[in-house]
């Protein structure tokens, strides 16, 4: 019978301590390399293509910077209102557009009013948006990342009446 470290046909190696040590080291090294390669492969494939943005009664987004991996085909943003006030008093939405378009999008959104979630449905500058949420509510939107051009700067804003000057954030493509 062949032992754990013994090669068939060479029983002398089974009792040589140096051979046993080297053989164990080689097997351990191969197992370690295989394990590390499998882990590295998992990291390369797994991308986080979603995020949650929190808003509150103090007119804040947290975080105010969203990193979107270039490998993501679609990206989902969930807006969670952690405050207590109802949406009629302190509603928030999340609207994505080019950074240079945010002020215009906020103006036309405010004019669109509450029944349109403060987003003009004809405004082609809007890339994606959530509905308006009040305290304890959340809303999600998934969008095609092909709409985002590398090298262009993007941001997000709350277009609820009066919120856009302070409720802003930036998108970083990485």
Region spans (language model):
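N-terminal edge beta-strand
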Residues: 48-74
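Extracellular/periplasmic metallocenter environments
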Residues: 128-174
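Beta-strand cores of secreted/periplasmic/IMS beta-sandwich domains, seen most often
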Residues: 65-89, 94-96, 140-149, 153-154, ...
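Extracytoplasmic/periplasmic copper-protein system
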Residues: 47-56, 97-119, 161-174
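N-terminal amphipathic/basic-hydrophobic helices that include classical n-h-c signal peptides
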Residues: 1-23
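Bacterial N-terminal signal peptides that target proteins for export
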Residues: 20-32
